[in-house]
């Protein structure tokens, strides 16, 4: 294994419940299950479809509210140590639907900015498949030497389009039963198992 790709929200940053709450301000009937369904495929495709069909009202200044969440959020200590450990032996990058500059600011705040060679957010491209291919091409790394750590079925599907395998984590948006549908290499329930699982692949 040469390259470890990380999703951000729900994997490195515990933001998914807060993001859900932001959306419920204008969507009182938005259930957690329906919010999860936006990420069964590409998040933006699911979200945009709901907006176009009149089933979802966009939040006022979502990015501003999201930035405030990151300003006060701290990465879990075990995940912090995991990133530091993995960065000594692998190239690490973040593939996210969040804003690139917000993620970079968070990494600086948490003392992890030097651990990631690249951060590709939604402002780079809305497709994670596109962003994964971009990283593979940039560093001439084969898909078989890459793994994507994510909390959503949609991400697993997008990585699969690049022939990149995934590791699902259950401390984010989707639970084990949903992640299993994408047939990831492994599903991890406890952050302290992350490094061990990756090093065994």
Task: Describe each model-derived feature in a short phrase.
Residues 67-94, 100, 104, 130:
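Short, acidic loop-to-helix structural element flanking the phosphoryl-transfer center
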Residues 1-6, 192, 201:
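Non-catalytic pre-domain segments flanking phosphatase-related domains
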Residues 3, 129-158:
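Conserved Lys-Pro-Asp/Glu-containing loop-to-beta segment of HAD-superfamily phosphomonoesterases
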Residues 35, 113-127:
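A short, structured active-site edge motif that brings together acidic residues
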Residues 88-90, 139-145, 201:
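Glycine-rich phosphate-binding loop signature in dinucleotide/nucleotide-binding domains
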Residues 148-188:
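Acidic, Mg2+-coordinating phosphoryl-transfer loop and its flanking beta/alpha structural elements
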Residues 2-80:
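N-terminal helical cap/lid subdomain that shapes the substrate entry/recognition surface
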């Amino acid at each position: 294994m040469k390259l470890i790709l990380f999703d951000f929200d729900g994997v490195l940053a515990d933001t998914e419940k807060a993001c859900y709450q932001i959306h419920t301000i204008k969507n009182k009937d938005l259930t957690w299950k329906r919010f999860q369904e936006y990420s069964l495929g590409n998040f933006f495709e699911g979200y945009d479809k709901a907006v176009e069909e009149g089933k979802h009202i966009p939040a006022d200044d979502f990015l501003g509210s999201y930035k405030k969440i990151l300003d006060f959020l701290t990465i879990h200590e075990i995940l912090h140590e995991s990133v530091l450990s993995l960065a000594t032996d692998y190239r690490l990058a973040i593939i996210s639907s969040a804003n690139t500059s917000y993620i970079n600011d968070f990494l600086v705040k948490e003392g992890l900015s030097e651990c990631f060679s690249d951060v590709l957010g939604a402002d780079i491209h809305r497709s994670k498949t596109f962003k994964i291919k971009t990283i593979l091409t940039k560093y001439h790394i084969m898909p078989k030497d890459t793994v994507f750590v994510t909390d959503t079925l949609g991400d697993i599907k997008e990585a699969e389009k690049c022939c990149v395998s995934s590791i699902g984590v259950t401390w984010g948006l989707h639970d084990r039963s949903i992640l299993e549908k994408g047939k990831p290499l492994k599903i991890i329930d406890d952050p302290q198992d992350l490094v061990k699982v990756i090093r065994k692949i």
